[in-house]
Amino acid sequence: MFASCHCAPRGRRTMKMIHFRSSSIKSLNQEMKCTIRLLDDSEVSCHIQRETKGQFLIEYICNYYSLLEKDYFGIRYVDPEKQRHWLEPNKSIFKQMKSHPPYTMCFRVKFYPHEPLKIKEELTRYLLYLQIKRDIFHGRLLCSFSDAAYLGACIVQAEFGDYYPDEHPENYISEFEIFPKQSQKLERKIMEIHNNELRGQSPAIAEFNLLLKAHTLETYGVDPHPCKDSRGATAFLGFTAAGFVVFQGNKRIHLRKWSDVCKLKFEGKTFYVIGSQKEKNAVLAFHTSTPAACKHLWKCGVENQAFYKYAKSSQIKTVSSSKIFFKGSRFRYSGKVAKEVVEASSKIQRDPPEVHRVNITQSRSFHSLNKQLIINMEPLQPLLPSPTEQEEEVPVGEGVPLPKMDVSEPLIASSPVKGAQCADPPDEEEDRVKEDPLTISELAYNPSASLLPTPVDDDEINMLFDCPSRLELEREDTDSFEELEADENAFLIAEEEELKEARQALSWSYSILTGHIWVNPLVKSFSRLLVVGLGLLLFVFPLLLLLLESGIDLSFLCEIRQTPEFEQFHYEYYCPLKEWVAGKVNIVLYMLGCS
């Protein structure tokens, strides 16, 4: 009887264990629905499993389009905290998503081509055109009034073709929303260019001409990240093919080329851009609303720098956001770089796939998207006061004309290559890039708040600059040292006790090292490790002084000095410490000289 009672529960436990294992295997094979919204607002659905990686979805959409130049594109999603992320191809989709299935994602342009002329296939140009059209509609592409009219006319020509009085009413542009602020003056200018300058252009040529104009604008390819600078002013950060850019109001206040950016890092809510030694402001710091927004900003910067800066993907290294002696987030861009993508595009030899275009009337982005997103979200306030009288007449103000192209000269419709010859060579364009503030419009850069990757909460950002704990520390430091008076005998007694304890500690440590006293092996190994560490420190410290102070031009010393980590240590830690020690020494010498 006793044996039967003992075996029964054991059998039940075994059955439960088998049931647990079978359910876990079943959960691994469970399919989850994933919906991807495309650039024309259509949707594609598929089913994935728990271990499916992000690369599967990217390949799935590229196969759906028959897209070969796929390295410019990526898939973006939003977590429950309204923070945007780019889907990482080498990680499991299930582990990246912080919400429950079914999942909804968006297929978007991740890296904007620096030169649209080098895009091989019409399909790729069409998808980039759809992305630029979205950027225009949501206010991310800031430009002058004349440029805005030309871009709008290219969109109308691509969507509707030539102008015919019998088919197009007098105010046919007003039926469609192309810009976030679309005035009657802008609509009249768009119709004028559409009627007179773009006649005869096919949709492919009109789209190509739009790309040629858009890629010359300062905000081309900018995915705006709102944050606060060191003074508390709101700024928009972005990454382009030229480098890291900062916009405030209607001006680009910073442009740091990728060759001048040594390192990008973040700590909590603070994002740092560390430049080379020749820069006036070697380190730029910005504050985001949340740590997740800061990490997303850092990842975007690392990926864009790797894509546009390096000549080969094999040159890309894993980067860390940490300081020198502390471990932080590590990340590596795993895709191709821009030069490799252009080289691969030049080798494409196939019959171009058919392009299925969707015009404005069939797209939801100009109707339902405006109602669902724009109205439900409060737009960011302009950073600089914009003239209210001109807002109704001029949606994008007459600013300083940007380089390269003149809108008054239409591109030749018969050949996009001939029209492209009007543009200056890329090398001359890069030589004209300046880092001084550049006025690009009379209106403040104010993209739609509903589509920003890192929403800004002004109250939360302002809390970064308010430290209540600072007041408590000041109160604690107000204690007077006058209450700590003691007589000379008490100090002498204390000194004798300290000397006695020191002698005992030295004798005890000597006995441990010689083996006269038995101690725990763990303690002994720790003490030996400590001694070895101190010995290494005594060796490394003179070597560090040799690197910092000596002018020896050995090859390995020069390589160490040029590393971003060493430059960061030199400017952020060593120089301030050196100045502080020098100041203290000068004070002591001055006091000795006076005495």
Curated annotation (Swiss-Prot):
It is found in: Membrane. One of its GO terms (molecular function) is cytoskeletal protein binding. The chain crosses the membrane at residues 529-549. It comes from the Eukaryota. Signal peptide: none annotated. PROSITE patterns: FERM_1, FERM_3. Its main location: membrane. It is a single-pass membrane protein. Keywords: Membrane, Transmembrane, Transmembrane helix. One of its GO terms (cellular component) is cytoskeleton. Residues 32-312 form the FERM domain. Putative tumor suppressor gene that may be implicated in the origin and progression of lung cancer. This is FERM domain-containing protein 3. It comes from Mus musculus.
